[in-house]
Amino acid sequence: VLAGALLHDVGKLKEISPDMGFPYTTGGRLLGHITITVMMVSEAAAKLGSIDEKKLQQLLHIILSHHGEQDKGSPVACATKEGFVVHYADEIDAIMNQFDVNNTEGTWEFNKMLQRYLYL
């Protein structure tokens, strides 16, 4: 779970450019951060050489399923408890970040992502 939590979005480092406005890279647009992450982790595992294949598959499943469902962008749906843990932790993190969109405390604001008013 810890490795999945730490690595699931590492592909964003290659998906998004550090240039002004943080545009997507060509590779980012063509492959997306999930595919890029799987490639990076697979390459690192191959360099290590002696990694347990079952553990690698479980880690790759966490990465591939961290958006939860295929209709939400995951190539595969969560099928392990570790996958669900990382998915829901990532989802809670995204929800909590919505409270930081507007820093005006004590106000109500409609949030398009969550489709509801939030009290800030």
What are these regions (language model features)?
Residues V1, H87, T104-E105, E109-L120:
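N-terminal intrinsically disordered, cationic/polar leader segments
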Residues V1-N102:
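Divalent metal-dependent catalytic cores for phosphoryl transfer on phosphate-bearing substrates
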